[in-house]
Amino acid sequence: MIERGKFRSLTLINWNGFFARTFDLDELVTTLSGGNGAGKSTTMAAFVTALIPDLTLLHFRNTTEAGATSGSRDKGLHGKLKAGVCYSVLDVVNSRHQRVLVGVRLQQVAGRDRKVDIKPFAIQGLPSAILPTQLLTETLNDRQARVLSLNELKDKIDTMEGVQLKQFNSITDYHSLMFDLGVVARRLRSASDRSKYYRLIEASLYGGISSAITRSLRDYLLPENGGVRKAFQDMEAALRENRMTLEAIRVTQSDRDLFKHLISEATNYVAADYMRHANERRIHLDQALELRRELFSSRKQLAAEQYKHVHMARELSEHAGAEGDLETDYQAASDHLNLVQTALRQQEKIERYEADLEELQIRLEEQSEVVAEAAEQQEENEARAEAAELEVDELKSQLADYQQALDVQQTRAIQYQQALTALERARELCHLPDLSADSADEWLDTYQAKEQEATERLLSLEQKMSVAQTAHSQFEQAYQLVASINGPVSRAEAWDVARELLRDASQQRHLAEQVQPLRMRLSELEQRLREQQDAERLLAEFCKRQGKNYDPEDLEALNDELEARIAALSDSVSQAGEQRMTLRQELEQIQSRVKTLTSHAPAWLAAQNSLNQISEQSGETFESGQQVTEYLQQLLEREREAIVERDEVGARKRAVDEEIERLSQPGGAEDARLNALAERFGGVLLSEIYDDVSFDDAPYFSALYGPSRHAIVVPDLSRVRDLLDGLEDCPEDLYLIEGDPQSFDDSVFSVEELEKAVVVKVAERQWRYSRFPSVPLFGRAARESRIESLHAEREALSERYATLSFDVQKTQRLHQAFSRFVGQHLAVAFEADPEAEIRKLNTRRSEIERAISQHENDNQQQRVQFEQAKEGVAQLNRLLPRLSLLADDSLADRVEEIQERLAEAQDAARFLSQHGKALAKLEPVASVLQSDPEQFDQLKQDYEQARQTQRDARQQAFALSEVVQRRAHFSYSDSAQMLNGNTDLNEKLRQRLEQAEAERTRAREALRTHAAKLSQYHQVLASLKSSFDTKKELLGDLQRELQDIGVRADAGAEERARQRRDELHTRLSNNRSRRNQLEKQLTLCEAEMDNLTRSLKRLERNYHEMREQVVSAKAGWCAVMRMVKDNGVERRLHRRELAYHSGDDLRSMSDKALGALRLAVADNEHLRDVLRLSEDPKRPERKIQFFVAVYQHLRERIRQDIIRTDDPVEAIEQMEIELGRLTEELTSREQKLAISSRSVANIIRKTIQREQNRIRMLNQGLQSVSFGQVNSVRLNVNVRESHATLLEVLAEQHEQHQDLFNSNRLTFSEALAKLWQRLNPQIDMGQRTAQTIGEELLDYRNYLEMEVEVNRGSDGWLRAESGALSTGEAIGTGMSILVMVVQSWEDESSRLRGKDISPCRLLFLDEAARLDARSIATLFELCERLQMQLIIAAPENISPEKGTTYKLVRKVFQNHEHVHVVGLRGFAAPPADALPGPAEVS
């Protein structure tokens, strides 16, 4: 028999009136006796505080402040403590004889709220010799002690070996320890449990029938059927979860396409944009690098162009300067040529004019003679004409005068006067004052003779003049020739000068004959000199081009060197061309190969993805296609093995399910037919009677009853006999035992217990030996243990079955994946990585491009060197033939010498050219210069004088002839004389007039004809003179101009000048062409530099923009990559095969996916908003956020009980594996989990029946309890009528309400609530839900009504109410009920606590003076029978006969208050020494 634990003592430290007081507690009743204020309630409060240290519950009423608020309420504890550290400690010895101190440290908290700080603790392993006061205080001297703080107490205990102090931060942990050690009867897990326990203590403390307990007796007495309720709840939860899972499967099946579509489109949408950005980033990086290369190349090219520009500008400036000089030289040469040509033309003109002048001179002389003759003849004709004219005029005037005289007298006078006038004129001309008309005739003859004489003399002089003029003209001609050759010279020196000139002329002719040879020699030397100058210029240019000065003698060696260099460079260039061709061919091959690999890469990447997938799924690494096919065969074998193992596990799981179902039968009946037979026979299953047997006792009873442990216990076997006839629906062996089901015991067998076995004497000659089963099934605890283990096994089997099913499905899908891989990708999967080869080829291509670029640069340099060498050789080819010229230093001197000789010869030739004809003319006539014909002037003067004399004589003769002709008029002295002779005179006059007019006409005609001739002669002469003078003047001008020109106009001058001009023109043209070429090149260079500068600026701008774009894109890309890696979606988004698509294709792919996504997420506001935000092209990370949001959304929609992954993509793969299997499994599970209404009714009925039996057992313990008029106390348990109807309908009429229980939309609890509403429509359900009502209806306690009844006097059994009982009766009745509650708690908790622990039982009773001695004795008897401790507080007049009594007296000494305690043993007890005296410790 297990000994019950006991409270040994209560220790109060530093309480009000108790400094260090230990109350030893009696094993039964401890009485605290004393007057009011003695400290009884303080002691009990300390005990209760140590038991339940919960300030939310502690409430000691006698010190409660009336009307105080809850915030400042004292709770009655603050005033019971003194300042400082206080302790309340219980010393307990449990059933294992373990000593444990449990208690609390209390301390007042300063403040107006009068709060108390409580700290629970426990001390284990303390030796029994150490008292609590010794442990909690420190003795200072004989009269003084100090209370230790909790830390000091801990330090003190740490020094004790084997002693352990535990402090608790929660009351639950504190009570858990107390329950495990058997200090409290019930595990107080929650505040509700603590509240129940405190209410029980409170009801015990203050006595009477507590309404708080009687109203909730079901909660105190009826244990919560947690197992059944939990089973229902678990079953419902399993069904609900099963249905939800099935619904989730159906939704998931419907969502699978949505998953696929959403994931596919989201992946396409985001991955395409992700890869497009990755491609663009790579392209931008490549572009940035390319721009940087172009930038550096452009800078280098610009520097080269600038250098080239400087070089060409310098060369252009040199050519421009040279061009100015050449233009000057060319212009000078052109001018010289023009001058030479002009001089030649002038010379030709001079010669032509000289010839013309000579011819004109001859013609002029001849014409002068003709004019002189014509002039003379004209003078004669004029004289005759004049005479004839005078005569005619005279005759006409005479005739007119005569005619007039005929008419008037005056006419004769006029004629007479005219005659006189003519006479006077004749006198004047002839100087004859005596001339008269009569002598006029004579004088006429005289003067005609004079005229004849003068004419003859004139002719003689003219002949002399002609001869003299000829001699004079020869002298003058010779003199003019000398003067023209030598210049002005005196006539006397003319002969000497002429002779000197003729002598020099021969020397001049000799020199002139040397002009042409000298000119040819000079032309040759000048040509050589020009060639020498050209050679020097070429040499200077060559040295300038070569950048080094060379001597002429070094040019041949340099030529050989340059030709060798040209040959080497030519070979190098040809080899470079071949090498370049080879490199370009290799580059083309690489590009072709890269193109082929690029087109092949997506298929290879798809194959690699598929290979990686099957490798991840299989956990294997495949190196060849043969390994794949071999592994495919292994998969087939593994699939067959997994299917066999799965079927075996499924069979075992079904067997376990059947066993669980069998063991879960109500009452422990393994056969459901036994329950029906028990109801039919009115008995109870033996297993149901022993349903509460402990797990440790189950093997014994199972072996004790053996095969009859499934027997039916009936009150009377005879009544059952008739029912056995015709019984068919029953087990093969049916055991019936007669006995009272309410008080059945195992006395029906004679049994002997052995080691792990029993021997049962069934009869005198029949024994049965039964060993304790290794897995007992007798009793609810054993069955529950077995069911629990079976459930664990079933869970393991289910998990194993699910695993195997999953493995089978996985293997099948893996087999399908391998089959697809073999069919689609095996041919390319194990080929070499095209991307790696592409990278190698790209590296090689870069190397080749660099090599080509370097080769081009080298080749360009070689070409430049080749062109330079070639140009040098060309220049040398022009220079080498002129090396002799370069070495000829005397050429210039020879040229100068020849030029001087040529100048002399040219001067001689020019002299001869100018004066050769004059010298030739002078040579034959030079001798005439010896004598000067001076008389020519006198002869000429005489000739002029004779001519004037002849002219005067002719005039005189004419005048005399006119007088002679008018001689008749002298006779007109009077008019009468004239009138008389008018007829004859008139006739004469007329005849004479006619003759005179005829003569005049002839004279006029002769004069006119001769005048015309003379005029013509004069015109010819004037023309000749004018022409002669003009040409002579022109000749002088031309000679002066020729002298002014200062150029030797010889025959070769023009050719030399033209050659010089043409040479300079060629050089100027070459210089201009070179300058133009340089200007064009310079313009092109400047344009190229401008283009390069603009290109450089553009490249710099583009490079900086691209670099900024790359840098900014890098930050955004880093954020994107960080987001991708943080969310683990890189594998989904980085689809390498998309890297081979163009940006437009990827953008089109993303746009198409975006359109599909808009439709797909149209009903999801969150995804729709995130998708809308992700459309911003400037925020690519939002697409990642959308992708993550899609994944998160899909993860949230993944049922983890169906699919064991968080990855939606893997979830889709697992869906295919799991959905079909789970659908089938969950459908069968739902059928198994379906709750039968009849089984629920049976379970509730059996539970109610069991609890009614337990309450009846408790009532047996209360039958002998009596208080005053109360003779007995009992608990009455009845089933409520409405609930009984519900049970009956569930058991018998459930088929009428299958619409509720077969509905998939309702849980069993909800269906039960709906049925309750159908059966009790009059009951208002309020605001409670059907689920809540159904859960209440599954709790059997709600079916029962409990009330306390007392058998009082003559009234019989009455309901226990405070108003119907006296105070003492009420206290006793309430104490009885509390004892029942404590005992019920112990029974309920027996399976939770160790089997070797029997908990302490202790109750309180304050103000026990209201009980009489009989009632107190009853309490003592109850305590003794129930092994219960009781603490009673009573006034001093109570002196119980049993137990321990403490007399408490509160005293005040010197303003110091303390309680004087005296302890006494009960009088009826065996003699014993008195307990220690009063404690005076202060």
UniProtKB/Swiss-Prot annotation:
Protein name: Chromosome partition protein MukB
Record's keyword terms, sorted: ATP-binding, Cell cycle, Cell division, Chromosome partition, Coiled coil, Cytoplasm, DNA condensation, DNA-binding, Nucleotide-binding
HAMAP family the record matches: MukB
Origin species: Cronobacter sakazakii (strain ATCC BAA-894) (Enterobacter sakazakii)
Coiled coil: 337-418, 444-472, 509-601, 781-805, 835-1116, 1210-1265
Region (Flexible hinge): 666-783
Main subcellular localisation: cytoplasm
Keyword Cytoplasm listed: yes
A GO biological-process term: chromosome segregation
Subcellular location: Cytoplasm, Nucleoid
Assembly with partners or alone: Homodimerization via its hinge domain. Binds to DNA via its C-terminal region. Interacts, and probably forms a ternary complex, with MukE and MukF via its C-terminal region. The complex formation is stimulated by calcium or magnesium. Interacts with tubulin-related protein FtsZ.
Highest taxon above the source species: Bacteria
